Regions:
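A secondary-structure capping/hinge motif
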Residues: 54-56, 110
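Amphipathic alpha-helical packing segments from all-alpha helical-bundle domains
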Residues: 69, 74, 84, 99, ...
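Basic, helix-initiating cap at the start of DNA-binding domains
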Residues: 1-25, 29-41, 55
Length: 195
């Protein structure tokens, strides 16, 4: 029991260290030895949990996917109307970006560093955005169904596609400018999608 707890703790330390390093210096610039040194684990422990750097990165992305989507869902769960939940997805991103020092999206950053379109890392990035897309589509359908007289002429699939483009552009520009104004513009643009 104690050994299992220690193994989980070591794995978590490795992931926390990798999260910090990948976010601050990128995937390619982060070496395995640096992760091992900064996490304070033995090489054998590292390789027991993560046989390759790609395995570590994949675990990092899966953890990020879960935490980011849960954060968005928690944010929109506090909203009372279909309209506020729909808009809440992009509204949730400004505080998230500020908390991450405007480093942008882990998935976009990782995909930019991984040229192979068949890479598991790129596939995980796409999976993240597909999960986000499914959430937005669900909220778009909920919005249309909440007031068919007002929103009945809207195409939930088209709105979802436009919303995704706005999110991607807003996140990328917030990282480039190291400022939140692109997110605020993105919020206004999403609001206009359904007006």
């Amino acid at each position: 029991m104690k050994a299992a707890k220690e193994a989980r703790a070591a794995r978590e330390r490795i992931l926390e260290t990798a999260t910090d390093l990948f976010a601050n210096q990128g995937y390619r610039a982060t070496g395995i030895n640096e992760v091992i040194d900064k996490s304070g684990v033995a090489k054998a422990t590292f390789y027991h949990h993560f046989p390759t750097k790609a395995d570590l990165c994949l675990a990092y992305l899966k953890t990020r996917n879960s935490s980011e989507l849960n954060s968005i869902k928690d944010f929109i769960a506090k909203k009372r109307t279909p309209w506020s939940r729909f808009l809440g997805v992009i509204e949730s991103l400004e505080p998230w970006l500020k908390a991450n020092q405007m480093r942008g999206c882990s998935f976009l950053n990782m995909v930019a560093e991984e040229p192979d379109p068949k890479s598991p890392l790129r596939k995980e990035g796409k999976k993240h955005y597909e999960s986000l897309r499914n959430l937005i589509r669900k909220l778009a359908v909920e919005l249309v169904e909440s007031d068919p007289q007002h929103y009945g002429n809207l195409d939930a699939d088209a709105i979802t596609d436009e919303y995704m483009v706005i999110i991607g552009g807003s996140i990328a520009l917030a990282e480039i400018y190291h400022d939140a104004w692109p997110m605020r513009q993105g919020i206004d643009m999403v609001a206009r999608l359904v007006d």
